[in-house]
């Protein structure tokens, strides 16, 4: 026989962003607890609202599985004394297992006998094991915690109820002075205390007090209600997944409704309106069937439809206050002068250890100009990059960005166009923030991409120079994101700019405001981002080998990694890698700058390898380069079959090492082949 277990923890309102993660964490920890305690089960269901986290275990065994464990002890010669009696070592061993010497048996392992005991432990009843469930609750981790009343124990929010049912039987447990029972709380305003009759009636019991505890059902209710509004009003609603997930975790009983605002606010840029509605008020944006913004919004109430008219009016009033701010800043900011704003950036601190935003922009401008020489820009693009790098942060001092910081760059583009700047310049101002997340959109224009690269590169080098380096998960200045952006942009635009040379050049640029340092740490940090971009689908040995190459051009490195993955599936890969590894390992013994003297060759195989290396140009894409290199395998094999490298004649030995080094210098532009796994 099996039973179903219900565990519900009732709390004060949780922050929306932790609800789903906490629900999943509770489910995982309950599953681990049951497995560790040998309580079998069929499946686990999880539930959550802003005021509760819950788990239902389906098909929970009534008893633990019996435990039979074998323990190996000392060898027989240690376990028995000279009289054939059990020694103190043997007695201590069995006593530590809660047994007596009667349980001892001897088993032979690799020709020697050892003490073994078998321990039998009968399974406990599920109810007995479940008394430790509070330990699961106390083990939950949260990004923020608090303590309340006289509790020294910190938790995400104060705990109000604990419900633990095994079918219809309430278990007698305590957690943070809260005694378990069958009582749960209903909706804060519409519901009341409710008795959970049975683990199986959990959802239906809570529905009677206006709580939809299944997040999937709550989400579907929201979507269905929005769909009904779309049909009734002949409109289209932007369903932003992140916003939907947030709203889902703000309500226990959702009711969607549509509100309106004055048409005059549509004269304000759409991004301002969308930001006001979505980011600040958690409203869904409404459009007509052609995609044009309408003076409407969709919100979701935490409650039913009673007095919904009052709720709509209240939400409209709050939104209008936001839109008034947006309209005011839009009009006032247009009176500002870009050059005046740029001049004032000298008084804005980028970081107290690094200097002002003006100094950051000045360095960025020099780096951008240096990058422009590497990628080939038209005269028009060069002029646009030069102008954009002079002014690109000006919008940080506008009223709009001061109020809505999410619009930095976006408003810069709009104000730049209004001030008569070219479209190239304006676009670059917006795009220099991209990508703003690991999977975020990339710049589409060359000018924007170069400005983004230069800005991110100076940010990285500057913070490293003053020892503000990320450690562990701590990255307050988002340097990992900035560096990931650098790598993604280089890959997307196919710009094979050697990163090591680029960083070296940056360190040599003349800046009065800051001296870059920590070059090795910077390169290691960039390598970690390239490694992450390769992804776990690329085996670690291939990632390591490519990262150790001498050709630090991001697009080529990523392409080479993929080419080696493909090659590793071929029949000749293992042999080719083994022989190249041998070449690399021997070449490490060569002099610092070995010179090849063909007069010292003693056999045809040396000459053949020399000619093959001379003809090896590694042209084409990465796949073709790998194929060209692996094509030398037979020549390398013949060389090693007929040639001893480490001979007594120093001149001959060094000449052969020089020959191998010449192959390494070419092969290493792809990868450090002796780091590859050939097994």
Curated annotation (Swiss-Prot):
Keywords recorded for this protein, A-Z: Aminoacyl-tRNA synthetase, ATP-binding, Cytoplasm, Ligase, Nucleotide-binding, Protein biosynthesis
GO molecular function terms attached to this record: arginine-tRNA ligase activity; ATP binding; glycine-tRNA ligase activity
GO biological process: arginyl-tRNA aminoacylation; glycyl-tRNA aminoacylation
Sequence intervals crossing the membrane: none
Catalytic activity entry: tRNA(Gly) + glycine + ATP = glycyl-tRNA(Gly) + AMP + diphosphate
GO cellular component: cytosol
Intracellular or extracellular location(s): Cytoplasm
SUPFAM superfamilies reported for this sequence: HD-domain/PDEase-like
Pfam family, one: tRNA_synt_2f
Keyword Ligase: yes
EC number(s) recorded for this UniProt protein: 6.1.1.14
InterPro entries for the chain: DALR_anticod-bd, Gly-tRNA-synth_bsu, Gly-tRNA-synth_heterodimer
Similarity comment text for this entry: Belongs to the class-II aminoacyl-tRNA synthetase family.
Assembly and oligomerization: Tetramer of two alpha and two beta subunits.
UniProt name for this protein: Glycine--tRNA ligase beta subunit
Protein species of origin: Streptococcus uberis (strain ATCC BAA-854 / 0140J)
């Amino acid at each position: 026989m099996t039973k179903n277990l219900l565990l519900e923890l009732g709390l004060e309102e949780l922050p929306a962003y932790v609800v789903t993660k906490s629900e999943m964490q509770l489910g995982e920890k309950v599953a681990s607890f049951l497995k560790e305690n040998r309580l079998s089960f069929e499946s686990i269901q999880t539930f959550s609202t802003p005021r509760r986290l819950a788990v239902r275990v389906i098909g929970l065994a009534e008893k633990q599985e019996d435990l039979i464990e074998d323990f190996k002890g000392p060898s027989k010669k240690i376990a028995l004394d000279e009289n054939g009696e059990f020694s103190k070592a043997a007695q201590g061993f069995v006593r530590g297992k809660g047994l007596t010497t009667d349980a001892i048996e001897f088993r032979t392992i690799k020709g020697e006998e050892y003490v073994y005991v078998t321990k039998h432990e009968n399974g406990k009843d599920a109810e007995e094991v479940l008394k430790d469930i509070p330990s699961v609750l106390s083990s939950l981790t949260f990004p923020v915690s608090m303590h309340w009343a006289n509790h020294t124990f910190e938790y995400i929010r104060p705990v109000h109820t604990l419900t633990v049912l095994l079918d219809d039987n309430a278990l007698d447990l305590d957690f943070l002075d809260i005694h378990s029972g069958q009582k749960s709380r209903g909706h804060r305003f519409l519901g009341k205390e409710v008795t959970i009759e049975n683990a199986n009636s959990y959802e239906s019991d809570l529905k009677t007090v206006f709580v939809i505890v299944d997040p999937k059902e709550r989400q579907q209710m929201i979507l269905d209600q929005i769909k009904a509004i779309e049909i009734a009003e002949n409109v289209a609603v932007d369903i932003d997944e992140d916003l939907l997930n947030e709203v889902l975790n703000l309500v226990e009983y959702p009711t969607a409704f549509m509100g309106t605002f004055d048409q005059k606010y549509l004269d304000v840029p759409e991004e301002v309106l969308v930001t006001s509605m979505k980011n600040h008020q958690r409203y869904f944006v409404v459009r007509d069937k052609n995609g044009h913004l309408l003076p409407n919004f969709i919100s979701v109430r935490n409650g039913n439809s009673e007095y919904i008219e009052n709720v709509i009016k209240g939400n409209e009033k709050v939104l209008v206050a936001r839109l008034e701010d947006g309209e005011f800043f839009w009009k006032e900011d247009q009176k500002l002068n870009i050059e005046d704003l740029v001049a004032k950036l000298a008084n804005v601190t980028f970081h107290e250890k690094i200097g002002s935003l003006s100094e950051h922009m000045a360095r960025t401008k020099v780096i951008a100009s240096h990058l422009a020489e590497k990628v080939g820009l038209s005269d028009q693009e060069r002029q646009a990059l030069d102008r954009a790098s002079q002014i690109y942060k000006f919008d940080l001092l506008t009223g709009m960005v001061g109020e809505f910081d999410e619009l930095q760059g976006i408003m810069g583009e709009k104000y730049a166009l209004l001030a008569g700047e070219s479209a190239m310049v304006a676009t670059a101002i917006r795009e220099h923030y991209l990508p703003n997340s690991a999977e975020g959109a990339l710049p589409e224009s060359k000018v924007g991409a170069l400005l983004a690269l230069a800005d991110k590169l100076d940010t990285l080098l500057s913070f490293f120079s003053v020892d503000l380096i990320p450690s562990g998960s701590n990255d307050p200045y988002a340097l990992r994101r900035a560096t990931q952006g650098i790598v993604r942009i280089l890959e997307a635009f196919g710009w094979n700019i050697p990163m090591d040379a680029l960083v070296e050049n940056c360190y040599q640029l003349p800046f009065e405001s800051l001296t870059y340092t920590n070059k090795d740490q910077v390169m290691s940090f960039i390598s970690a981002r390239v490694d992450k971009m390769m992804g776990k689908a690329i085996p670690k040995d291939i990632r390591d080998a490519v990262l150790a190459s001498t050709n630090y051009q991001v697009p080529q490195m990523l392409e080479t990694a993929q080419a080696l993955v493909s090659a590793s599936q071929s029949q000749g890969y293992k042999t080719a890698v083994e022989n190249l590894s041998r070449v690399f390992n021997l070449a490490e013994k060569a002099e610092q700058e070995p010179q090849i003297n063909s007069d010292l060759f003693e056999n045809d195989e040396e000459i053949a390898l020399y000619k093959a290396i001379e003809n090896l140009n590694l042209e084409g894409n990465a796949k073709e380069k790998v194929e060209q290199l692996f094509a030398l395998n037979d020549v390398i094999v013949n060389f090693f079959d007929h040639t001893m490298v480490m001979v007594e004649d120093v001149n001959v030995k060094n000449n052969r090492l020089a020959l191998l080094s010449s192959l390494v210098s070419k092969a290493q532009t792809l990868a450090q082949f002796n780091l590859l796994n050939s097994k």
